[in-house]
Amino acid sequence: MLLVYENRNTGVSAEWKKPVHVPPHLHEAIEVVYVTDGEIELGVGQELFHMDEGDFAVVFPNVIHHYQVFGEKENKVIFLYLEPTLFPSYYRELQIYSPKNPVVKKEQVHPDVVNAIKYLTGITEGDPRMIQAYAQMILAHVFTTMPMMDKSAVGSDDLIYNAVEYVAKNFRENISLEKMPFFQG
């Protein structure tokens, strides 16, 4: 299994694309996913979550996740990447917690979330305060409607998972096998 660390720290960025299989990866950005056509599978930690058209999901910073696409359908997804430091009121929670289930089914997605995603996807330039307000609205709905759990419970006892997670969190430090806690004793 190839794991990838992505450095996404550009404030707020959006991609509207046809999803493909994406290998396990993690990054410091909050990843918002909204299926506009078809279906995809979102893997978070060791769990796989099915998403249909109209479903919304969020992956918190530094959580290993991946995507799978099955079937021959036309699938389109909006991906938003939100830099967590833009949201100081949520920053601590974003580091500690993760949604128990990252997917909200279409019937439960609040219309404000859909409008905010579409607004953020459609702009190329705009007032940074408006951009931040729309992104903040998404996070407000996430934290008020999605049950949270400790982020450490999302992971796995898998050696590769733990190694990638450790490197991602400590890449600015001098890293050696002796310093990695899961290789000791």
Show which residues each predicted segment covers.
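N-terminal regulatory/effector-sensing and dimerization cores
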Residues: 7-98, 127-128
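Surface-exposed loop/turn and secondary-structure junction residues enriched for glycine/proline
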Residues: 90, 97, 106-107, 178-180
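Basic/polar phosphate-binding segments, predominantly the helix-turn-helix DNA-binding elements
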Residues: 146, 169-170, 174-185
